[in-house]
């Protein structure tokens, strides 16, 4: 019986040791997972910020080009329709500079709402059922 009890005691110690190792392993795995998730999240955020900045810069460049074309086109239309004589049209203005100045002016209203706020649907009028007169 003594041998049997000693064997059970050893088995119990083995189970306790295994449980401790498992607990330690799970804790380490959870910590590594957390680190991995935080790393991926930070890299994703950096990528999004870079992407937004890149898109904003390209949009600004395109607006500058478009503004220059519109400015030149407006001058040509004004001259062609006789509103302005070609000689009277200012030649010292460069369309690219005018478009660049327009692109750099601050907006009166922000394009996006402050963080944490969302657009809400406008209130809908209640539906009234229409009954035709007999």
From Swiss-Prot:
It is found in: Cytoplasm. This is Beta-synuclein. It comes from Homo sapiens. Non-amyloid component of senile plaques found in Alzheimer disease. Could act as a regulator of SNCA aggregation process. Protects neurons from staurosporine and 6-hydroxy dopamine (6OHDA)-stimulated caspase activation in a p53/TP53-dependent manner. Contributes to restore the SNCA anti-apoptotic function abolished by 6OHDA. Not found in the Lewy bodies associated with Parkinson disease. Residues 89-134 are annotated as: Disordered. Belongs to the synuclein family. Phosphorylated. Phosphorylation by G-protein coupled receptor kinases (GRK) is more efficient than phosphorylation by CK1, CK2 and CaM-kinase II. The lineage of its organism: Eukaryota, Metazoa, Chordata, Craniata, Vertebrata. InterPro entries: Synuclein, Synuclein_beta. It comes from the Eukaryota. One of its GO terms (cellular component) is axon terminus. GO terms for molecular function: calcium ion binding; cuprous ion binding; phospholipase inhibitor activity; transition metal ion binding. Residues 98-134 have a biased composition (Acidic residues). GO terms for biological process: chemical synaptic transmission; dopamine metabolic process; negative regulation of neuron apoptotic process; neuron apoptotic process; synapse organization; synaptic vesicle endocytosis. Sequence repeats lie at residues 20-30, 31-41, 42-56, 57-67. Keywords: Cytoplasm, Phosphoprotein, Repeat. The modification Phosphoserine is found at residue 118. Residues 20-67 are annotated as: 4 X 11 AA tandem repeats of [EGS]-K-T-K-[EQ]-[GQ]-V-X(4). Expressed predominantly in brain; concentrated in presynaptic nerve terminals. The gene is SNCB.
């Amino acid at each position: 019986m003594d041998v049997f009890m000693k064997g059970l005691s050893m088995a119990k110690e083995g189970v306790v040791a295994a449980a401790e190792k498992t607990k330690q392993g799970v804790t380490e795995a959870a910590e590594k997972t957390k680190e991995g998730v935080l790393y991926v999240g930070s890299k994703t955020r950096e990528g999004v910020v870079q992407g937004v900045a890149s898109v904003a810069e390209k949009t600004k460049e395109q607006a500058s080009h478009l503004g220059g074309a519109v400015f030149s086109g407006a001058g040509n239309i004004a001259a062609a329709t006789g509103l302005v004589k070609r000689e009277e049209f200012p030649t010292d203005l460069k369309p690219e500079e005018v478009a660049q100045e327009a692109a750099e002016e601050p907006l009166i209203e922000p394009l996006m709402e402050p963080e944490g706020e969302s657009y809400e649907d406008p209130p809908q009028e209640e539906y009234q059922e229409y009954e035709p007169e007999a």
